[in-house]
Structures are given as C-alpha cells and as structure tokens.
Amino acid sequence: MAHKKGASSSRNGRDSNAQRLGVKRFGGQVVKAGEILVRQRGTHFHPGVNVGRGGDDTLFATAPGAVEFGTKRGRKYVNIVRTVRSEA
C-alpha cells in the first residue's frame, strides 16, 4: 500500500452530468406544436417542413402532425406531416 496518494489521484474524482441528448419523438408519432423532437449538439438532423431549430440546435415542431425522418442530398431531415382530421 502506498503511503502517499500518487501523482494525480488527488486531482481526479469529478464527472459531469449527462446532457440527455437524442431523438425524443420517433417516426410516425403524432406531436403537438412546440414539442421537442431532437436534442443535439450541432446539426446532425436538419429542420424540415413544420420544424424549427432552437439556439442550441434543438429541433421542435411548429405545427401539429406526425413525425417523419428522411434524407435529401445526403442530409438527414425531420419533417412534420400535417394529419387530416375527418369531422365525424
């Protein structure tokens, strides 16, 4: 057993909290306006139709509808497809 702590062990012992990033609403799910779709750092997913982008690159729905993921010219996009309600 060492009687001294060692070179850097006394400077260790910190860890940061997880950032909870990732896709929050998946393809086909119905969302309301304002719901967060993707939390990300940088634009891994780009905003498409009826999707806005926040200051921290979070994607959110700007209109109600179903979530749709797709690619265009090598970029991944998230769209909101408006669902047609039948008045019954």
From Swiss-Prot:
GO terms for molecular function: structural constituent of ribosome. Keywords: Ribonucleoprotein, Ribosomal protein. Residues 7-19 have a biased composition (Polar residues). One of its GO terms (cellular component) is cytosolic large ribosomal subunit. It comes from the Bacteria. It holds the Pfam family Ribosomal_L27. InterPro entries: Ribosomal_bL27, Ribosomal_bL27_CS. The keyword Ribonucleoprotein applies. Coiled coil: none annotated. Residues 1-22 are annotated as: Disordered. The keyword Ribonucleoprotein applies. GO terms for biological process: translation. Gene3D superfamilies: 2.40.50.100. NCBIfam families: L27. Belongs to the bacterial ribosomal protein bL27 family. This is Large ribosomal subunit protein bL27. The gene is rpmA.
